[in-house]
């Protein structure tokens, strides 16, 4: 079970997430996000996890290929998360350079908002609740993932519902942001991160 801790805004949080066993550390570059980081801050975050096994992921919802290449070169980011328009064009120009995550937005009723573009299992699909930052899950019982083996469950996963999500859907990984945050300050709670990552790893072992 892979775990991505997303919306990291501080190097100390990244370091603690990596120590707790997070596989991926996500940094958001969307200017309209409260969790948006600058290139300078992202570089410090990447440096904070260099000695561990966590992989830095840049979240680029509407950036051009040129912008993504420039930011990743400056920061040292090695994986990217994409969404938005011109996705096939971006795949074709970026897949040789990066591991890629692709976001599929899901309505509250569990229905994906759009069909899945053509892609192979090297791309990790992340299912996220439309509205993104509300911190509540979509209807997992009504949800069926596309025929794509490599996918993560996102959008409202937390320590109190992770067991239900994994037992219902058996994802390859989980993507968590607000579910491990300290209230009101956009910093991660070290103990929540540790507990959630441990739960994810233990639950995935029990479902094998």
From Swiss-Prot:
GO terms of biological process kind: L-tryptophan biosynthetic process
Recorded superkingdom: Bacteria
UniProt entry keywords in alphabetical sequence: Amino-acid biosynthesis, Aromatic amino acid biosynthesis, Isomerase, Tryptophan biosynthesis
Pathway: Amino-acid biosynthesis; L-tryptophan biosynthesis; L-tryptophan from chorismate: step 3/5
EC code: 5.3.1.24
Recorded catalytic activity of this chain's protein: N-(5-phospho-beta-D-ribosyl)anthranilate = 1-(2-carboxyphenylamino)-1-deoxy-D-ribulose 5-phosphate
InterPro entries in alphabetical order: Aldolase_TIM (IPR013785), PRAI_dom (IPR001240), RibuloseP-bd_barrel (IPR011060), TrpF_fam (IPR044643)
Membrane-crossing residue ranges in chain numbering: none
GO terms, molecular function: phosphoribosylanthranilate isomerase activity
Record keyword Flavoprotein present: no
Family: Belongs to the TrpF family.
HAMAP family in alphabetical order: PRAI
Protein name as annotated: N-(5'-phosphoribosyl)anthranilate isomerase
Source organism (scientific name): Chlamydia trachomatis serovar A (strain ATCC VR-571B / DSM 19440 / HAR-13)
């Amino acid at each position: 079970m892979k775990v991505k801790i997303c919306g990291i805004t501080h190097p100390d949080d990244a370091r603690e997430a990596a120590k707790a066993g997070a596989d991926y550390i996500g940094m958001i570059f969307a200017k309209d996000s409260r969790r948006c980081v600058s290139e300078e801050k992202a570089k410090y975050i990447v440096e904070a996890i260099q000695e561990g096994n966590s992989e830095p992921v840049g979240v680029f919802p509407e950036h051009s290929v040129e912008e993504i290449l420039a930011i990743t070169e400056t920061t040292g980011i090695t994986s990217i998360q994409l969404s938005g328009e011109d996705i096939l064009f971006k795949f074709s120009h970026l897949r040789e350079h990066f591991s890629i995550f692709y976001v599929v937005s899901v309505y509250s009723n569990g229905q994906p908002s759009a069909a899945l573009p053509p892609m192979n299992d090297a791309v990790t699909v992340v299912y996220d609740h439309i509205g993104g930052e509300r911190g509540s899950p979509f209807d997992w019982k009504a949800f069926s993932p596309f025929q794509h083996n490599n996918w993560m469950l996102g959008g409202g996963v937390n320590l109190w519902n992770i067991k239900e999500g994994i037992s219902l859907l058996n994802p390859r990984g989980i993507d968590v942001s607000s579910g491990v945050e300290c209230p009101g300050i956009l910093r991660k709670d070290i103990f929540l991160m540790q507990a959630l990552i441990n739960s994810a790893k233990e639950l995935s072992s029990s479902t094998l």
